[in-house]
Each structure stands twice: as C-alpha cells, then as structure tokens.
Amino acid sequence: MHLQRALVVLALLNFATVSLSMSTCTTLDFDHIKRKRVEAIRGQILSKLRLTSPPDPSMLANIPTQVLDLYNSTRELLEEVHGERGDDCTQENTESEYYAKEIYKFDMIQGLEEHNDLAVCPKGITSKIFRFNVSSVEKNETNLFRAEFRVLRMPNPSSKRSEQRIELFQILQPDEHIAKQRYIDGKNLPTRGAAEWLSFDVTDTVREWLLRRESNLGLEISIHCPCHTFQPNGDILENIQEVMEIKFKGVDSEDDPGRGDLGRLKKKKEHSPHLILMMIPPDRLDNPGLGAQRKKRALDTNYCFRNLEENCCVRPLYIDFRQDLGWKWVHEPKGYYANFCSGPCPYLRSADTTHSSVLGLYNTLNPEASASPCCVPQDLEPLTILYYVGRTAKVEQLSNMVVKSCKCS
C-alpha cells in the first residue's frame, strides 16, 4: 500500500515537472541581488586580507613607480594565465586559494650582456642565461603559492626563419652523474612578429631555490637542438648550424640605452626579464587544504553579455570602491566588474538533475528546505589590488573575486 502511494506521488511529480519549470531561486530582483553582492564583496576583501576593518587611507599623492610596475605586471600575468587555462575544467578550492597573496617582483640581475650568452656552437649564440636573487624571501619557502618567469620577446627583422622553438631549463650544479639542466617548458615562437610577454610556471624551481640557496644557478632559454638545422621530414642538415634568432628585451645588445639616458634606463628595467612570486603570509593560512572540486563549463561572459538570456546567466556588475564601498584606501584599480549570477533554472529531468523527482518529493515533505536548483557561480577569477597600510604599499592577489560563468545547482 505504501509502495503504491509512493508511486502515485512520483507520477504526480513527473507530471508537474513541466509546469514547475523554474527554480524557486528566481524571485530575487536585480537591485536586491546587487546590494547583497556589494556587501558580500566588502566582507570578502577584508576577510581575504585578514583585516577586521578597512585601513585608514594613505595621504601619499603619488604611487612609487616600482610599486605601480609590480601591480601592472601582476595584473597582466593573471590575465595571461587565466586566458591560457580557459579550457581547464578543474579549479582548486582550498584554503590556499582563498586568502590574498603577497606579490613580489625580482628583476633579472643585470651584468655584462655577454655573461647572458652561451655559445655552444662556434658560429653563434644558442642560449640565454637569466639569474635572479630571491634570498630575501628564503624563510617563506613553504608559503610560496606560485612563481612565474616573464620575459619580453622582441621582433627580429633580420631573422632567417619565421618561427623557432625555444626551451626553458633550470641550470643544475655540475655533476658527472646527472644532467646539467632540468627541462621546464618549451614554446614555438614567431621571430618577427609583434613583441609579446612570455610566461613560464617556475614554481617548483623557485621553491627549490628558496630551500637550498646553492641550487640557484639561474634559468636558461635555449633553442631546441643547438648546432643543427632540421628538414621538415626530421632529417638533420649537416654543417648548417642553428643559432638563436629569438630576441629578448633586456638581454640583447640592441637594447643598450646609452649613457645618461635615465628615461630609457627606466624603460629597460620595466621591460627586463623578471620573476613574479605569489606568497601566502603565515598568518593567513591556518588549516591544511580543503580539497579540490571538479567543475563543468558553464554560461560565461562571452555568451551572457552578448545575449538577452533570461535564464541563469552571469550578469555584469561594476563595483566602484569609493562610490559603492566608501573606500579610499584601495589605490588600484578604482573599481572592477565583480558580476553576479541570476536567472531561472530549468527544473527538468536532465543529466544534471537526474534525481529531480526525488528532489521534488523531498521538497513536498520539507517545504522549508530549498532543494530546487539555483543559479550560482561556477568559474571565478582573481583580482589584483594595490593598497596602503600606513605608508607601506602592498600589491596582493585576491582569489575568486570575478564571476566569469554560472551554472544551475
């Protein structure tokens, strides 16, 4: 008897599925959502910085050039990283992801340019060496979250080839029993195209440097196979030696600014090869990682901002730090698109709602609970901010601050 009643209830729920095709989470109006989102962002930023209240705004009129340069480099790096990983369906959801990261920039140690060149072959340069001093953060080895090596590729109009493969290596201590290099990454690059920043993930390498200072012998960018040129079929062309035709800003002689030209010297330093380190301050990390979640692709800004989609989608929301939050202590950016998710969620039996009938029955028996699908964020991106605590400038990365896509869940 009880089984028959259950079957009747399930049948009625299936029949009602079409009429109950909208989520119960769709009754909120946009103004209400915006107010809630603004307040959530206020608390989120303070929480990620481990601040109990907003710091007093700085009276400094001008931001130091090196601080602004660090902010711009970090922002550009994050844009590149998330652009390259747009197809990655996984996202870490750990405590280390949550809290803000302190940003450090280390420029390449400048020296005589010939010290940056390696001539494995007798007729030309095949490698470039990049050295860095990261000893100032050695005590924070366990707090390293990410490290990126960035170098600006410049066009080479006199190049004999249109494309060349380069490979990045960690230089190891000389030992007859092990290799002298450790491969990190490789890229196929145009030699004459417009200038572009190249980024390489060197987290493991820098972590080793922080752990053992003597292991920091620098990085090497080399052509794929020094001293040889290959035919399209893979055969080696004897007696034709390949040399590096990729040019890098800050390491090639063409960049010599001349004596006394402070403006060009400053520009060269801004564009010189450098490391960007993201460190988690010890006071912001109390617990071990909280695990990872696999996420599926959702409706993103590319679709939602171009279409008048009424169902669940990401909606644009610009937050002005001064006008919306009443904050003067954040110097850069002045505001950003935080965005939010809103819209009805289809309440139909599908791959994502296989148990919709069971959820419906649960809703009937538990009217106060919410088992209906809601429009929620799926993919989020970080935000880089420049702010002052007293007279000390800080550049930090705040994770998961920009909603890029949504899903029904």
Curated annotation (Swiss-Prot):
Q: What PROSITE patterns would the database entry show?
A: TGF_BETA_1 (PS00250), TGF_BETA_2 (PS51362)
Coiled coil regions, renumbered to chain: none
Q: Where is this motif: Cell attachment site?
A: 259-261
One Gene Ontology term from the biological process aspect of the record: negative regulation of macrophage cytokine production
Q: Where is the signal peptide?
A: 1-21
What SMART domains is this protein classified in? TGFB
CDD domains, from UniProt? TGF_beta_TGFB3
**Cystine pairs:** 304-313, 312-375, 341-406, 345-408
Taxonomically, the superkingdom here is: Eukaryota
- Name the glycosylated positions: 72, 133, 140
GO cellular component terms, alphabetically, are: extracellular matrix; extracellular space
Q: Pfam families of this UniProt entry?
A: TGF_beta, TGFb_propeptide
Key words, A-Z: Cleavage on pair of basic residues, Disulfide bond, Extracellular matrix, Glycoprotein, Growth factor, Mitogen, Secreted, Signal
Q: Which GO terms describe its molecular function?
A: cytokine activity; growth factor activity; identical protein binding; transforming growth factor beta binding; type I transforming growth factor beta receptor binding; type II transforming growth factor beta receptor binding; type III transforming growth factor beta receptor binding
Please report the PTM annotation for this entry.
Transforming growth factor beta-3 proprotein: The precursor proprotein is cleaved in the Golgi apparatus to form Transforming growth factor beta-3 (TGF-beta-3) and Latency-associated peptide (LAP) chains, which remain non-covalently linked, rendering TGF-beta-3 inactive.
> Which InterPro entries does this entry report, sorted A to Z?
Cystine-knot_cytokine, TGF-b_C, TGF-b_propeptide, TGF-beta, TGF-beta-rel, TGFB3, TGFb_CS
Q: What does this protein do?
A: Transforming growth factor beta-3 proprotein: Precursor of the Latency-associated peptide (LAP) and Transforming growth factor beta-3 (TGF-beta-3) chains, which constitute the regulatory and active subunit of TGF-beta-3, respectively. Transforming growth factor beta-3: Multifunctional protein that regulates embryogenesis and cell differentiation and is required in various processes such as secondary palate development. Activation into mature form follows different steps: following cleavage of the proprotein in the Golgi apparatus, Latency-associated peptide (LAP) and Transforming growth factor beta-3 (TGF-beta-3) chains remain non-covalently linked rendering TGF-beta-3 inactive during storage in extracellular matrix.
Which family, according to UniProt?
Answer: Belongs to the TGF-beta family.
Summary of subunit composition and partner proteins: Interacts with ASPN. Latency-associated peptide: Homodimer; disulfide-linked. Latency-associated peptide: Interacts with Transforming growth factor beta-3 (TGF-beta-3) chain; interaction is non-covalent and maintains (TGF-beta-3) in a latent state. Latency-associated peptide: Interacts with LRRC32/GARP; leading to regulate activation of TGF-beta-3 and promote epithelial fusion during palate development. Latency-associated peptide: Interacts (via cell attachment site) with integrins, leading to release of the active TGF-beta-3. Transforming growth factor beta-3: Homodimer; disulfide-linked.
Protein known as: Transforming growth factor beta-3 proprotein
The source organism is Sus scrofa (Pig)
| Annotated gene | TGFB3
